[in-house]
């Protein structure tokens, strides 16, 4: 098995449990250069809120930094942005879906920043 298949296999039990809970899901995806965060509806059929390091506003804030989209500072900024957008959409309670990634580094930085900005999970 390759790394992607293994990671997705690790994510299955978490996603199954979140589906049973019936709450919005904060899903995280990280690539080598960028990080993405989506809040998905309880039915799992639509993205309610999203934020990533590809957004123009985020790119201007990160301009001049080395590894601009792929570091913990960028992940923390995305966590804060997704939490602010979620609160504006009336969402406070979510379940955290790390998508099979270890809860460490950029994933942890995003989660901590989202909690500090007011999301509950």
Curated annotation (Swiss-Prot):
Cellular component (GO) terms are:
cytosolic large ribosomal subunit
Per UniProt, which keywords does this protein have? Answer: Ribonucleoprotein, Ribosomal protein, RNA-binding, rRNA-binding
Protein origin, superkingdom: Bacteria
The cross-references to CDD domains, in alphabetical order and at most eight, read:
Ribosomal_L18_L5e (cd00432)
Record Pfam families: Ribosomal_L18p
Q: Which cysteines are joined by disulfide bonds?
A: none
Give the GO biological process terms.
translation
MF-aspect GO terms: 5S rRNA binding; structural constituent of ribosome
* Subunit details: Part of the 50S ribosomal subunit; part of the 5S rRNA/L5/L18/L25 subcomplex. Contacts the 5S and 23S rRNAs.
Record function comment:
This is one of the proteins that bind and probably mediate the attachment of the 5S RNA into the large ribosomal subunit, where it forms part of the central protuberance.
**Membership in a protein family:** Belongs to the universal ribosomal protein uL18 family.
Q: What's the protein name?
A: Large ribosomal subunit protein uL18
Source organism per UniProt: Bordetella avium (strain 197N)
